[in-house]
Amino acid sequence: MKNNYINTCVVYLMATFLLISLISIKKCTADLSAHPLCPDNLKDYCIHGECHFLEDVQEPACLCETGYRGKRCHELSMD
């Protein structure tokens, strides 16, 4: 399965000698396979993927099958 769970990371680069602040948004992937599988009441949360439970935030997250993306692996991917 392709790991499509994406976190947004903000990176700040300061060029103080020019008094310019550059802010860029980058996509960061998380290794969901390190998290436990979702409990039975959430086993169908991911439409086309595998549900993992993020214990630190108490939320489910999906590892999408190839060809799918989105929070619940519900969107076809053209990648």
UniProtKB/Swiss-Prot annotation:
Keyword tags: Disulfide bond, EGF-like domain, Neurotoxin, Secreted, Signal, Toxin
Gene Ontology biological process terms in this record: epidermal growth factor receptor signaling pathway; positive regulation of cell population proliferation; positive regulation of mitotic nuclear division
Family: Belongs to the EGF domain peptide family.
Gene3D superfamilies: Laminin (2.10.25.10)
UniProt-recorded Gene Ontology molecular function terms: epidermal growth factor receptor binding; growth factor activity; toxin activity
Protein name: OMEGA-myrmeciitoxin(02)-Mc1a
SUPFAM superfamilies xrefs: EGF/Laminin
Signal peptide (residue range): 1-30
One annotated Gene Ontology cellular component of this protein: extracellular space
Keyword ATP-binding: no
Domain of life: Eukaryota
Subcellular localization(s) per the UniProt record: Secreted
Primary location group: secreted
InterPro entries recorded: EGF-like_dom
Disulfide bond residue pairs: 38-51, 46-62, 64-73
Domain EGF-like: start-end pairs: 42-74
Function as written in the Swiss-Prot or TrEMBL entry: Ant peptide with probable defensive activity which acts as a potent agonist of the mammalian epidermal growth factor receptor (EGFR). Mimics, both structurally and functionally, vertebrate epidermal growth factor (EGF) peptide hormones. In vivo, intraplantar injection in mice causes long-lasting (several days) hypersensitivity of the injected paw to both mechanical and thermal stimuli. Its long-lasting effect is unusual for venom toxins whose effects are usually immediate.
Organ and tissue specificity: Expressed by the venom gland.
